[in-house]
Amino acid sequence: MKNNNSLKNQNINEYLEISKRRSLRIERIRDYFKEQNVLEVDTPVTSKSAVSDINIESVQVTINDGPFYLQTSPEFSMKTLLSMGYGDIYQICKVFRDYEKGSIHSPEFTMIEWYRLHFDLTGIIKDTCNIIACIIDDDSLIQNIT
């Protein structure tokens, strides 16, 4: 039987390995977009308005005695940037959705969202496959999606 310190060390080592793999995948995504000349943006995490999608519940917080909502997606802010004349953009960010808790769900998770001007459906599909391919370590899986 293992003692508590041994279990803690095992958990720390597992989490450290997961963190390293996650960091590498995010780095690969950033490298891909940099090669494609896509600008990384950073939009606000809070808003005075909740999301209008009836299937998504926003998380409300209080800031300076007023209600704010944590973003469920950076979509609205990113589309605002597009309307201001930004070109191709992407963002890797934390988003929040109430009632998304379960064995494989968390109310807080990381999302990647990107917009490409002048891409048709085929271009978007290829872009998505390229992003997936850059984070997959098994080459046999890459051949199946491209």
Task: Give the location of each predicted region.
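Short, acidic/charged, Gly/Pro-enriched secondary-structure junctions
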Residues: 31, 133-134
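Metal-assisted phosphate- and nucleotidyl-transfer catalytic regions
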Residues: 134-146
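Class II aminoacyl-tRNA synthetase-like tRNA-binding/catalytic domains
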Residues: 1-123
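Short amphipathic C-terminal alpha-helix that caps PH/PH-like domains
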Residues: 125-132
